[in-house]
């Protein structure tokens, strides 16, 4: 598991699309939490349980560990929770590229990951989930800008009618120890974090 963000990410399942739809599961973990023994959370345990299902019963799952501390440059993100927005966009891209009519969406998160999946649910509810053929990085950045600036405006409504699937429903949002993305309120860092995450 790996990605450009420096966090481990895992996907399981997601092969063929069965009649009656399939389950798409997003699991976002908390700060400093991983799948490693002694650092796993309820979010990580859910991922492991799904991973251990027989191959034919596994849903399509996206898991991403929380913000990690590997160098001093990571300290600001660990303290304030900044950097959560790209995580939400990656999870959105996973869903948008795989969703087909009839699929069921389940979102799970722990701590800041709980905040993230709630925001992801808000993004899908307010604007929508783009159809798979439109699930490009550029399109996801565009819908993110709409969500940040004017999710109820005319532009967002036109975007939703043009690019989004109107029948998307979220079956469940399961959160553990949900918090605001902003962590410790240090001068300067707190103000910047508020600007980056207040729109959620």
Segment roles from a protein language model:
Residues 2-200:
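Alpha-helical segment proximal to the catalytic Tyr-Lys
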């Amino acid at each position: 598991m790996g990605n450009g963000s420096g966090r481990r990410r895992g996907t399981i399942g997601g092969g063929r699309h069965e009649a009656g739809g399939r389950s798409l599961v997003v699991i976002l973990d908390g700060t400093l939490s991983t799948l490693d023994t002694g650092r796993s959370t309820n979010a990580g345990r859910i991922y492991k349980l799904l991973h251990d299902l027989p191959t034919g019963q596994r849903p399509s799952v996206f898991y991403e560990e929380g913000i990690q501390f590997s160098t001093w440059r990571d300290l600001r993100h660990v303290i304030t929770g900044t950097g959560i927005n790209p995580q939400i966009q990656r999870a959105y891209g996973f869903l948008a590229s795989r969703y087909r009519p009839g699929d069921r969406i389940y979102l799970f998160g722990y701590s800041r990951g709980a905040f993230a999946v709630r925001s992801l649910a808000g993004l899908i509810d307010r604007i929508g989930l783009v159809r798979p053929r439109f699930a490009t990085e550029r399109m996801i950045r565009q819908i993110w800008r709409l969500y940040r600036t004017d999710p109820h405006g005319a532009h967002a409504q036109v975007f939703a009618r043009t690019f989004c699937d109107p029948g998307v429903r979220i079956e469940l949002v399961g959160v553990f120890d949900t918090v605001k993305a902003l962590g410790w309120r240090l001068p300067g860092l707190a103000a910047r974090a508020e600007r980056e995450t207040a729109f959620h």
